[in-house]
């Protein structure tokens, strides 16, 4: 019975697909790590954010996000400024250099995605993207 349930589940397939993408995602080719790419994409999509809000968006601890932001700031991809209303807080924004690096990284990720999903037609890839986005939506 358990073997049938495992075969019926799509989770192992999604896990294997995720591992293939990560194995193919060479930071040298992308120009940054996948974590950095996700951070920049979040800032581009949402605009300037308080650092704590970015932690919530990325579902990652404050300490980890600070480490990522330090790396991105050193690269010139983000800027941190003190919140005008609460000087203890920092807001984070993507810089023009960060936007350019993100665009290059996303282009490489699309190329990798095409390689990993080569067995699917363009319509099937579009459907997969749509279904995955729907599955990842927050409830409510």
State the predicted function of each range.
Residues 22, 48, 70-133:
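Charged, amphipathic alpha-helical coiled-coil/dimerization segments
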Residues 1-5, 123-140:
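C-terminal regulatory/oligomerization modules of transcriptional regulators
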Residues 1-31:
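N-terminal leader segment of winged-helix/HTH proteins
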Residues 19-64, 75:
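N-terminal helix-turn-helix DNA-binding core of bacterial DNA-binding proteins
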Residues 9-12, 38, 53, 115, ...:
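Active-site phosphate/pyrophosphate-handling residues
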